[in-house]
Structure formats: structure tokens, C-alpha cells
Amino acid sequence: MGIFRLFASSSLFAMQQKYSRIFLKPGREASLRRGHPWLFSGAVLSVEGRPEPGDVVVAATHKRESLALGFYNPRCDIVFRLLTTNMDETIDESFWIRKIRTAMELREKVIPRGTNACRLINAEGDGMPGLIVDRYDRYLVFSIATAGIEKNREVVLDGLLREINPEGIYERSEGRARQLEGLEDRIGCAHGNFPGTAEITENGLHFRVDMLTGQKTGFFLDQRSNREIVEKFSDQATCLNAFSYTGAFSVYCARGGAKRVISVDSSEAANETARWNLESNGFSPHEYPIVRADVFSYLRETDERFDIMILDPPAFAKAKKDVAKAARAYKDVNLQAVRRIRDGGILATFSCSNYIDEDLFGKIVAGAVRDAGKTARLLQTLGPGPDHPTNLAHPEGRYLKGLLLHIST
């Protein structure tokens, strides 16, 4: 038995020697022990070896106790991104295949019938930091935001092809997150034939998705369960879908029996897709009008009152320095919205800004309700659906925050 233990210990030591190690300052391992998947540069005491950006390293205490394996990148503030706390694990092709299979098995359990589009891999929420994969029927759209996934790009792509066998895969790896990791943008077809647009079904409804240039990867998959919730309130209601993008909330409200739905967005391209989405589900844009306008101006100028209002604006805070300005914008738009909701009406309001947490967002909306001279009852907190899992110890991963409110005088 002693020989076996010695052998196991020696094997573990040999495995860990494959990787460089980062040693943490005393006490700075606490967040990792709690399950948070990030370590920041200020937590690092020293580095053993010469790891390059994107390499797998061992995170260890200052007393040399090995804690976890993860991606290392000294170029950015998040210096370590957790992959596993199982020190017997080897980060190889089989590791990524297991991760992809686990993600697929979860989606098979949580995606409703009549739906062929979902978030297939949700970065840290699926143990693959920096990787987003969305499925639109027979096509995949993915983005890579970390140097670690970038180094494993071909292995991950091979795994997706093997496990899913899509007709086409398109890459949209771009934006500030890649810049912070020292990566250049990469956009283009990664496999097969890629038509640019897809027609999907969600809960039996039909939608067109611009996978090449649409926001995010073309469709707000994270709002699916929230659209179902709003639909339940829409019978005989007058609804305003503000920042309507391609009109998915509007289609759900129309199916729910709304007598009037107005969709407001500043993008004509998005509005054109919204018209198609309404018509393909049997709803005329003449009866359910689409307005190209700035939402802030529209809310100030309209005299109409609504039973239901949906506010799903773009991220107002894309960096920490933007928080104060973003808070003012969120308060302004919610104030104008609450003023135009009938007594007993419903407000579904959202923020997708990473730097606006749930507590701050709630305070902003409460201030807007108070300034409007109204009362709000919280019916439900809203967020992404179960195909967007997040690590419970990683609130930063829960970027979409929402409140379902009953508004009264």
C-alpha cells in the first residue's frame, strides 16, 4: 500500500512538473478555494518556469500547495483562469472533448421542444473560460476571448465537429476582451458552408438570425425564458418593446394575445428583420408597428400609455470608468418608462452591463420608480435561461440582470 501511495504521489508530481507554476501571496488563494475562477495579477508572488500567454499553469500557495490548473496570461489583469482543481487532470484533447460532451448533455435536458437554437458553451459557466458557442439549427457561431482557448482553438474546433457535425461554423472572435488578452480579431468561416443567415424556431416561433453581423452572435438567446414570462402577461395588453432589436419580445407578446405592440429601435437593419419575424409568425407589421427611433427621445415624446413595457438596452457600461454615466442612463430610461406605464402595468427591465451588478441595478431602478412618483412590486428577478449556466462563485459571469415589476400609483 505504501508503494502504491508513493507511486501515485510520484505520478502527480511528474504531471505537475509538465506545467509552470505561479505562487500566490499569503491569503490570496482564498477566492480560488471558494470556487472563483479568476486570479488577478496582484495575487501573484512569483512564477516558476517561463509560461507564455495562454499556457496551462499550476496555481499554488506560497507554501507550495498545488490548488488548481488554469490558463495563464501575464498581459492582462486576470492572470489566471481556472480549468480544474483536480490535480490529476491532464489538459489535453480528451479534456476538451469531455467538456463539450458535458455541455451538450446539459442542453439536451434544458432546451424546450420546438427550439433548435441555444447557447451551447458559456465560457466559465461550462468550464471553458473565454469560449462562447451558439447553435442556430445546423450552424455554430463561436467566439474566443482568451489566449488559453486561442492556443487550443484547433482542438476545440475538432471536438465540435466530432460531437455535433454542423453544416457550418463561423467565428466572431473580436472586441475589447481579446485586445486585453493581446489577441487580434478573427472573423470568418471556420468550417463548411455558411449562409450568413439562419431561420430558427424557439418555442414554436420562427426567427431569422443574421449570424455574420447581428448583435452578439445574431440573436439574444439569453432572453428566451424571459420572453416566455412576458408573453403570459400580454393578453389584451398594449405593449412597448423598447430597444426591440429583431423584435423577439414583440412576437411573443403578439402570440400571447396583445392587442397592440410597438417595437422601437434605432437600427433599420434590425427593424427589417423584426418585420420578417412578425410576418413569418402570422402577425402584420401594420397591426404591430415597428418604429425607427432613438428610444430615449421616443419615450419623452410619446403620449401613449402602455400595459407592458420591455426595456432591453445595449450595455451602457463597457468599462469600469463608464459606471457613473451608465447609471444615469439606466435611471433616465427607466424613469421615462415608468411614467408611461398604466396603473397596474408591467415593466420588464434589463441590464447586460458587466460592470452594473444586480444590487446597483436594483437601486437605480428603485430610484427611477421613486422619482416617477410610482410604486413597484418585484414579481420576479430575471436572468439568462438554463443554457447560460454560471459558476455560483462567479457573479461576474451573470451579465444579464432583469426585474419584472408591477407598477402602481
PLM region spans:
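Non-catalytic accessory regions of SAM-dependent methyltransferases
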Residues: 3-135
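Conserved class I S-adenosyl-L-methionine
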Residues: 236-245
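Conserved SAM-binding loop of SAM-dependent methyltransferases across substrates and taxa
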Residues: 246-258
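Conserved SAM-binding motif I beta-strand of class I
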Residues: 260-265
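S-adenosyl-L-methionine
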Residues: 269-307
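Mobile active-site "lid"/loop adjacent to the S-adenosyl-L-methionine
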Residues: 306-336
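C-terminal catalytic and target-recognition region of SAM-dependent MTase-like enzymes
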Residues: 346-409
